[in-house]
From Swiss-Prot:
Entry GO MF terms: cholesterol binding; toxin activity
GO terms for cellular component: extracellular region; host cell plasma membrane; membrane
Protein's name in the database: Streptolysin O
Complex formation: Homooligomeric pore complex of 35 to 50 subunits; when inserted in the host membrane.
A matching Pfam family: Thiol_cytolys_C
Keywords, sorted A to Z: Cytolysis, Hemolysis, Host cell membrane, Host membrane, Lipid-binding, Membrane, Secreted, Signal, Toxin, Transmembrane, Transmembrane beta strand, Virulence
Species the sequence originates in: Streptococcus pyogenes serotype M3 (strain SSI-1)
Length: 571
């Protein structure tokens, strides 16, 4: 409160000083005026009463006003007049700004980008999963089944140059866009470099357009480039599509699914897309409960390319400095990239899924995808009859086949064939792009390195041995087999088994059934007959050491002592 009063007091004092200065000037002026009046009135009679000088009256009034102001609580407000900048200074500032905007940093940009020191493979290396511990084998008993789940550590190395486009990155992956070669790029989440640009020429490869297929975009932003591409496409539809058919350009890849990082590297696609659209159950796959194959069909309608620069600075406005690029992330660890082309069309993802434990699943799925008639192959037909199929279409008239789930693979074939022709009703969609290093126009390929566990499951069914002795002799048998299990570390545990009547003499006719568990392996069947000959008392009729487990193993012996006969058949 005291500060406020003090401030008011000093404000009044300042005002009074100003007023005093003005009054002083007035007094001086009046004094001079009075002198002149005195000289001109010397003839005035002396008997008149003298009048008080005007200066004295003015001083009295000023003093009274000063006292009133000092005793007042009102603040005296002073409004200092704003002094404008000198015109010379303004002109100088304007000149400096203009000079700065006209500075040419082309040589600096070229020198700095050419001098960036990096390894293309290292800056775009993507290290996926590293597998340390896993159970190599596991045995699961279910009723009359024994399921062996086998896991093998494998690795995959790929360097794809065409990167799948997802909706969330379309504004960073258009033709002529600038990006950073960093971790975000390897994860399909590129960082954009936004700055003032030089005009950029782009070219669309739709047939029949000739010179009209190339246009220059003055300011190559996402919006401007997209508008230019739309205009080119509309020109083609309006003027050139009548007598021209698009060349068929279909890219097809397939892979069994074992893990997220593995399928990303194998198909060059973000696993989140597949997981979200196709609903891949990675957990069931790792347990060996399901087998899944993914196929990707890329149908390219046209490609838009951006003219590659001769020098790095060609893409920038001359006012852009290297310091500005550094502020936006450019460095040895994240050199700049240039999107050289974008493919437009549609992508069809197909998921084939089964719970079959057959080792022929992959072959059956591949045959179906390639259009092979699998009905003539009993094994393949059985697998496909117990499978489900899902197709998801990205791009084109996706509303018609957004997502199809069926048990009939012919339906999937129709999805792939339908809407494969480019038209206004079936528009193209950005599906993949390629970038180059701005320094030297080398293609930027993501170096995928990942380990994964390949999980396979084999199902075995319990069986039996049917023994039948119809020979004219005394016979003996030896039936041996192993039962396989696995401990918690995946190590194989073998238990030796034998038939209780091994080496017992059996006369004809004789028959019996020996049950075998689903985990039976290394089956050995031996049968011998007594010849009665002193030099060869026992003669082997059957001696098989690697009999395969089957639903029914029929072992038959017959004949005479000198001419015995034996056979093993399977059902």
């Amino acid at each position: 409160m005291s500060n406020k009063k003090t401030f008011k007091k000093y404000s009044r004092v300042a005002g009074l000083l100003t007023a005093a200065l003005i009054i002083g000037n007035l007094v001086t002026a009046n004094a001079e005026s009075n002198k002149q009046n005195t000289a001109s009135t010397e003839t005035t009679t002396t008997n008149e009463q003298p009048k008080p000088e005007s200066s004295e009256l003015t001083t009295e009034k000023a003093g009274q006003k000063t006292d009133d102001m000092l005793n007042s609580n009102d603040m005296i407000k002073l409004a200092p007049k704003e002094m404008p900048l000198e015109s010379a200074e303004k002109e100088e500032k304007k000149s400096e700004d203009k000079k700065k905007s006209e500075e040419d940093h082309t040589e600096e940009i070229n020198d700095k980008i050419y001098s960036l020191n990096y390894n293309e493979l290292e800056v775009l290396a993507k290290n996926g999963e590293t597998i340390e511990n896993f159970v190599p084998k596991e045995g699961v008993k279910k009723a009359d089944k024994f399921i062996v789940i086998e896991r093998k550590k494998k690795n995959i190395n790929t360097t794809p140059v065409d990167i799948s486009i997802i909706d969330s990155v379309t504004d960073r992956t258009y033709p002529a866009a600038l990006q950073l070669a960093n971790k975000g790029f390897t994860e399909n989440k590129p960082d954009a470099v936004v700055t003032k640009r030089n005009p950029q020429k782009i070219h669309i490869d739709l047939p029949g357009m000739g010179d009209k297929a190339t246009v220059e975009v003055n300011d190559p932003t996402y919006a401007n480039v997209s508008t230019a591409i739309d205009n080119l496409v509309n020109q083609w539809h309006d003027n050139y599509s009548g007598g021209n058919t698009l060349p068929a350009r279909t890219q097809y890849t397939e892979s069994m699914v074992y893990s997220k990082s593995q399928i990303e590297a194998a198909l060059n696609v973000n696993s989140k897309i597949l997981d979200g659209t196709l609903g891949i159950d990675f957990k069931s796959i790792s347990k060996g409960e399901k087998k899944v194959m993914i196929a990707a069909y890329k149908q390219i309608f046209y490609t838009v390319s951006a003219n590659l620069p001769n020098n790095p600075a060609d893409v920038f406005d001359k006012s852009v400095t290297f310091k500005e690029l550094q502020r936006k992330g450019v460095s040895n660890e994240a050199p700049p990239l240039f999107v050289s082309n974008v493919a437009y069309g549609r992508t069809v993802f197909v998921k084939l899924e089964t719970s079959s434990k057959s080792n022929d699943v992959e072959a059956a799925f591949s045959a179906a995808l390639k259009g092979t008639d699998v009905k003539t192959n009993g094994k393949y037909s059985d697998i496909l009859e117990n499978s489900s199929f899902t197709a998801v279409v990205l791009g084109g008239d996706a509303a018609e086949h957004n997502k199809v789930v069926t048990k009939d693979f012919d339906v999937i074939r129709n999805v792939i064939k339908d809407n494969a022709t480019f038209s206004r009703k079936n528009p193209a969609y950005p599906i993949s792009y390629t970038s180059v290093f701005l320094k030297n126009n080398k293609i930027a390929g993501v170096n995928n390195r990942t380990e994964y566990v390949e999980t396979t499951s084999t199902e075995y069914t319990s069986g039996k041995i049917n023994l039948s002795h119809q020979g004219a002799y005394v016979a003996q048998y030896e039936i041996l087999w192993d039962e396989i299990n696995y401990d918690d570390k995946g190590k194989e545990v073998i238990t030796k088994r034998r038939w209780d009547n091994n080496w017992y003499s059996k006369t004809s006719p004789f028959s019996t059934v020996i049950p075998l568990g689903a985990n039976s392996r290394n089956i050995r069947i031996m049968a011998r007959e007594c010849t009665g000959l002193a030099w060869e008392w026992w003669r082997k009729v059957i001696d098989e050491r690697d009999v395969k487990l089957s639903k029914e193993i029929n072992v038959n012996i017959s004949g005479s002592t000198l001419s015995p006969y034996g056979s093993i058949t399977y059902k």
